[in-house]
């Protein structure tokens, strides 16, 4: 996932040159290779050892990392937007739009289903003492729908931009609200039981993601509001006002 983030970051540099873009493409291709290798390895595990798939998705801790598959997927989509769309035709813009709606539907069902299972599945339950920011992971893919929207919306036709932005803001807001509620549980856990074990402490950095991605998504989507379409055309200053509001909220 971090590999894809590096590729996107290299592409987003304001002072760029051909070599930097090439490095970004190489890192992006490397990300795809890693994704395919890891997918093959985990698939081989499930095939060679029957029953491990069921135990993995039903284990209260291991199942929390199922959403990381979709986090990697959205990273790949962002890379396609950064490096593929400028080099291809309109067809890839359409593909990205279709993939956006499919991704949104899949991750929303995943988030609802996984939290429902964690709330109801006996007898193994997660305890407050064992709480880590990994509890946020089931909602993370849904939240990154907003980031996905902010990446692709600038190249979409004006007629589709508003719906993508509304969906992106809604999913980003949902993810942020769930994450914010989880923070209160995590602070309670830290106050009552202290810091996690040393080997678990790097996972605390997961908590940095939701506010950062929310700020990035809001600013990105606000910069692509179709100012000359629909209600924004009737109210000329509305798009600029929403962009300024997004910056204030992000801060």
Residue ranges and their predicted role:
Residues 29-46, 108-115:
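Central hydrophobic cores of alpha-helical transmembrane segments in multi-pass inner-membrane proteins
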Residues 10, 14, 47, 75-85, ...:
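C-terminal ends of transmembrane alpha-helices
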Residues 33-37, 174-179, 249-251:
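Generic alpha-helical transmembrane segments
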Residues 226-242:
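Membrane-interface interhelical connector segments
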Residues 1-12, 24, 28, 51-78, ...:
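Juxtamembrane helix-loop boundaries in multi-pass membrane proteins
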Residues 5-26, 41-56, 84-85, 157, ...:
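Structural signature of multi-pass alpha-helical membrane transport proteins
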Residues 36, 76, 84-105, 109:
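Hydrophobic alpha-helical hairpins/lids featuring a short glycine-rich hinge
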